[in-house]
């Protein structure tokens, strides 16, 4: 048996149990009538016969212990997709339904709504820890990437009952702590997921993020240079840092910190120190000038964005760009001259995680206690 995956047919295993004598005879006749080639005892036919199967599990894209249930004569073979199988076998809230699965979101590579929601399901293990207990802002593209978009902070009135919220400054922010909520948002075509630097229960950040924003896509090498210079500094102070491509045109550096170990004012001491050090060392390459017209061809080191009430794109969030790019965590050895943002699309990221671990898998285990000491020393020097 096989399933449609993008433009290919993915072989998913086989079945023999569950067929009655009559059903087996019907199936054999259909195969004989439509066979294209034969290799040994194996007969090959074009896709066309749809069946419902019961199975135990999916392992390495293979179904195990499959059992025939029924022929599905009302379905076309191209409706039988791997994404549909993955979504159909999740333990989700009953109120959650996928609407308009064939709606086109990206044209090249072709990704429809079903494939996008399937991406969210497959990436949820890695993405949900960063969304957990944070006031979520999304950017929705209800008619696909080529259509209009808008920011959404409030839970809409029509949201199902399982969508949880927290009130903050007059907004009912959605709290995305589970797969059902994430997939409901995906079905609403929330393409971008922006998160604050703190949980809703806290007043202080649980991470620091530097946003390295080159003036244009061609200046991406400046982001690579800035990131590597930052790593040298962080390593010298035993600060554990994690880079990610933004999915747009830059690189972002995440630094996890212990909850309530630092205030926003204290983290500003550190971010300002790093930014000013780099622009003094490389004045022709980097700037902290907020007005774009005054930056010239220099990369903007955005340390101001790390503040209460501000947000950053969530790791593994898709971006509302022409290509289905993803804000993808990197290993530091990947931050080199070969790095290209456009490489990190939905299909690439899923394949990457099938064959490698997540670069941020230890993120929430880090406390970076040395950062507290460093900030104290910087403040002490400034007071002299």
Tell me the role of every PLM-derived stretch:
Residues 148-202:
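A contiguous, low-structure linker/loop signature
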Residues 180-246, 257-261, 265:
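Signature for HUH/AEP ssDNA processing cores
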Residues 127-143, 149:
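Short N-terminal amphipathic alpha-helices
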Residues 26, 30, 34-118, 125-133, ...:
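C-terminal accessory nucleic-acid interaction domains of nucleic acid-metabolism proteins
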Residues 1-6:
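Short conserved beta-strand segments at catalytic cores or DNA/RNA-binding microdomains
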Residues 138-142, 241-248, 288-293:
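Short beta-strand
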Residues 7-28, 158-167, 219-235, 255-285, ...:
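Helical (often loop-to-helix) elements that flank the catalytic cores of nucleotide-handling enzymes
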């Amino acid at each position: 048996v096989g399933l449609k995956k993008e433009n290919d047919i993915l072989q998913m295993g086989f079945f023999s149990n569950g067929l009655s004598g009559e059903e087996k005879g019907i199936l054999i006749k259909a195969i004989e009538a439509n066979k294209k080639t034969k290799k040994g005892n194996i007969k090959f036919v074009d896709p066309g016969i749809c069946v419902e199967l019961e199975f135990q599990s999916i392992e390495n894209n293979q179904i195990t212990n499959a059992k025939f249930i029924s022929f599905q004569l009302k379905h076309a073979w191209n409706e039988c997709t791997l994404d549909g199988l993955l979504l159909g076998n999740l333990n989700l809230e009953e109120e959650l339904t996928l609407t308009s699965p064939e709606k086109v979101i990206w044209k090249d590579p072709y990704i429809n709504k079903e494939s996008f929601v399937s991406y969210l399901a497959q990436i949820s293990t890695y993405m949900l820890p960063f969304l957990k207990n944070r006031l979520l802002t999304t950017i929705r593209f209800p008619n696909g990437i080529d259509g209009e978009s808008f920011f959404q902070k409030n839970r809409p009135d029509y949201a199902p009952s399982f969508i949880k919220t927290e009130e903050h400054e007059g907004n009912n922010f959605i709290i995305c702590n589970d797969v059902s909520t994430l997939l409901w948002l995906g079905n609403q075509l929330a393409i971008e997921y922006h998160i604050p630097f703190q949980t809703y229960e806290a007043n202080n950040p649980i991470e620091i993020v530097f946003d390295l924003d080159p003036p244009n896509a061609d200046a991406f090498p400046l982001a690579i240079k800035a990131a590597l210079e930052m790593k040298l500094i962080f390593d010298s102070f035993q600060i554990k840092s994690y880079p990610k491509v933004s999915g747009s045109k830059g690189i972002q550096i995440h630094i996890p910190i212990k909850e309530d170990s630092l205030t926003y004012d204290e983290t500003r001491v550190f971010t300002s120190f790093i930014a000013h050090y780099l622009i003094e060392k490389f004045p022709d390459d980097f700037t902290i000038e907020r007005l774009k017209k005054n930056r010239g061809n220099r990369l903007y080191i955005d340390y101001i964005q790390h503040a209460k009430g501000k947000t950053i794109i969530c790791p593994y969030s898709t971006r509302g760009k022409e290509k289905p790019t993803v804000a993808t965590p990197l290993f530091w050895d990947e931050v080199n001259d070969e790095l290209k943002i456009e490489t990190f699309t939905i299909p690439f990221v899923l394949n990457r995680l099938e064959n490698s671990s997540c670069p941020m898998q230890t993120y929430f285990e880090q406390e970076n206690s040395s950062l507290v000491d460093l900030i104290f020393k910087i403040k002490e020097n400034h007071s002299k």
